[in-house]
Amino acid sequence: MNLNKQENKHFVDLSHTVEHGMITYKGLPAPLICDYLSREESRKHYSEGTQFQIGKIEMVANTGTYLDTPFHRYAGGLDLSQLPLSSIANLEAIVFRANHPLRREIDASIFVDSDVSEKAVLIHTGWDAHWGSEQYFEGHPFLTKDAAQFLADGGAKLVGIDSLNIDDTADLSRPAHSILLQAEMPIVEHMCNLGALPDAGFKFFAVPVKVKGMGTFPVRAFGMIEYVEETKRGQTEQG
């Protein structure tokens, strides 16, 4: 009997859509999206029947689902152009479920007995359900200092969360950002759909544009789940 392995890939989109006028974080301006060259205006540059649109966007780096590099926190840290692809693409990933409605703090106990080394650690709080509402900006879940230190000591590759901020915004020292980015561990914030992922056994990608001199930029974050099926090949047995 021969076995034929068939690989099927399933992709889970983990990013919010960036739209004109949306607010990601109170106090930061919304993106402005418009035509730089409209289809109508482009017609004079091309043959009859040929037209294009060239878009223009004005936005702050912290828009939508975005990734922080060490440069976001530290002047001498790696910026977007220096970040190795090995730290943001094709990462073995693990999801920790922290969607407790009455508990904001996510401490190190959630990671106990887990091997986070070389993995993308994704923290599923369910807070993305409030995206686009006023509630999203108030009382969000966050990672405590000891939890961030556990991930840094454990050698995690990247940390992501589906919340407003990985830190408690009332703590102006931003301990989670400080610890993780000092350890050269990228952070992805404002994620979504983490509930659609398995706890482990998938790859994670969050790749921003390669920009020099910037520490943050939106990403198209996604998980890739591979299913391997074994099917029997017909084979005649002679008696």
Task: Describe these PLM feature segments.
Residues M1-G239:
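Active-/binding-site microenvironments in catalytic and ligand-binding cores
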